[in-house]
Regions:
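Short, low-complexity intrinsically disordered segments enriched in A/P/G/S/L with frequent Arg
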Residues: 1, 13-24
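Alpha-helical transmembrane segments of multi-pass small-molecule/ion transporters
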Residues: 9-11, 22-29, 33-354
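Extreme N-terminal basic, low-complexity initiation segments
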Residues: 1-7
């Protein structure tokens, strides 16, 4: 790599002296890479980011291999997901709030998170109104929302300051209104659940939301923050060991739930979901950078959240509504790979990691 960088530098110098721009594919690639790394403040940042990302990828791959080997039983993803959503994720949220300073301005991110999950859902509901019910369920439940608690939270906590984790929690509080039950309830009302109509839809949505421990944690902590009630340091210290386990458990859960089983004509539906999510992410990122009233670091974290994978509940809700859960699992797995690549590229290209 060192020799290649030297060759790339010599190639650029030679072109500057001759005054002519000629193409040499391999050397041009190394020259571009050399320019990219020169934009980052110090090699230690690059090394630290890549090591942490490599650890996340290794855990996901280990989870995928373990799930396929049946060494943890038939449905290990369900067991690990219960551990994450019951213990590690709520404790991680509590620890994030207790370790950083909250500012009321961050509350703006709650409706923004809700809007970023709700708008794609509405568009999918309108565009897919002539599709078969199973396909419509698949599009509506998998085009919206982000897996922030199990992917973006450990990612941001590993690479950014504690204050950024609080901003993330505000955004996810809005996102969770759709992804912990709102999308499922609306889909049941619009397309049906496959198990008959939902009686008392308002009660169903409220019950679904408040039965989610991460959402309950967000709600309580936001209320405490608004009234300027500090979380006792004893509570922060108590939750720290459990919160530290969230990154490993969440990434392992993602690996266990990845399924690459669908093929053929169904891949077109996956491509539609991936393309639509990418278009919405690009549009929301542009709006964030242009209009969000925060510093550049907070805007950057929001952009990373907008490229987070599809919600881990998407395949489950798809199954409950009578859709193709395996296809949902495939699209979910691809968005995880996409999120790792894009989030890492954003961090490396800007060089802002703590």
């Amino acid at each position: 790599c060192a020799l290649a960088n030297i060759a790339a530098r010599c190639w650029l110098i030679a072109q500057q002296r001759v005054g002519e721009r000629r193409s040499c594919g391999v050397l041009d690639c190394f020259a571009w890479g050399n320019w990219l790394f020169s934009r980052i403040e110090g090699g230690d940042v690059v090394e630290g980011v890549l090591i942490k990302v490599a650890a996340f990828v290794a855990i996901i791959v280990a989870g995928y291999c373990a799930g396929r080997s049946n060494s943890f039983g038939k449905r290990p993803g369900e067991v690990v997901s219960k551990i994450v959503f019951t213990f590690t994720l709520p404790c991680s949220v509590v620890h994030a709030f207790g370790s950083a300073q909250f500012t009321p301005q961050l509350l703006v991110l709650v409706p923004i998170g809700l809007a970023c999950a709700f708008v794609p859902y509405v568009v999918a509901a309108i565009v897919s109104r002539r599709c078969e019910r199973g396909d419509r369920v698949f599009y509506m439940l998998n085009i919206c929302g982000f897996n922030i608690g199990c992917f973006a939270l450990p990612y941001v906590q590993a690479l950014f300051s504690p204050e950024m984790a609080v901003a993330l929690c505000m955004f996810d509080a809005g996102n969770a209104m759709m992804m912990t039950g709102g999308a499922y309830a609306l889909t049941g009302l619009i397309a049906g659940t496959g198990k008959g109509p939902i009686e008392q839809p308002l009660k169903f949505v409220v019950k679904r939301l408040f039965s989610s421990l991460p959402f309950d944690a967000y709600l309580v902590l936001i209320i405490l923050a608004v009234f300027d009630i500090q979380i006792p340091q004893q509570v922060v210290a108590f939750t720290e060991p459990i919160a530290n386990a969230n990154a490993f458990c969440a990434m392992l859960m993602l690996g266990l739930m990845i399924g690459f089983t669908s093929a053929g004509a169904k891949l077109k539906k996956v491509a539609i979901i991936l393309g639509a999510r990418a278009l919405f992410s690009i549009a929301f990122c542009m709006l964030t950078l242009a209009f969000l009233p925060f510093d550049f670091m907070t805007k950057l974290v929001v952009c990373i959240l907008l490229w987070a994978p599809a919600s881990a509940m998407g395949p489950t809700f798809t199954l409950w509504c009578g859709g193709d859960e395996k296809l949902a699992g495939l699209s979910n797995g691809i968005t995880i790979v996409e999120a790792i690549v894009i989030a890492t590229a954003i961090v490396l290209a800007t060089g802002v990691a703590a």
